[in-house]
């Protein structure tokens, strides 16, 4: 039976999820949505957060610099040019992590930690594989380093196992939503056999890898490019932000394509093809995520911009 999703206080909803889960994963909101960032800051500043959560695992930092980040969030002085290496020397050749919202999270945790005793201070765990670019001088060097790390999703899973679960801690994971899928997607393409081969081995995202080891994860999608009100009309009346559990609701029974209408690009013998999620064969939303964080319609959202000094 389908019933309408109902909004709840998002901070309380996330913290309640930690009562039954050691890992809660939240989509970062399109790599730069300022309202998604504002929610994360409100969550971290909430006095209950540090009582329940020990670590924050982020996509936006190279784990090679973990020791330096530990010192920074603990309040030690770290030179600006040294600190920036954590997000500027990742495996990703783009400027997304230079958007102020990503550095801002590190500085916010540092600030929150000033009011916490040492044994309750929040730790930032950098999730990107530890590529040392000073040692990369050829494609072969990069392949070797990449193979040693094991991939952008398997590496943070190792970190969570070693630094969080083995130490009986709890972690908030902040990553792009496509890293948090439970099940693989099907894609519409001309060469369906090739696409199925490329995209449908065993699931290998962060959440699916953890759950394959019987570690249950509570996961939250943040819709910033589509309006959930197209799936359930009364969403327009919800306060922003709001959290909503989606199983058994119109929001949960909708196709994943309803939330992710974007193409990806695949390469084959005929060139590069633009492909989209197959809404019929792919798992529906409630098979991928437990809840959504509603921030308002896409037209009301704003985006973190690069500093003019970096443009």
Listing of model-derived features with the role each one plays in the protein:
Residues 1-311:
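Compositional signal for N-terminal targeting/processing segments
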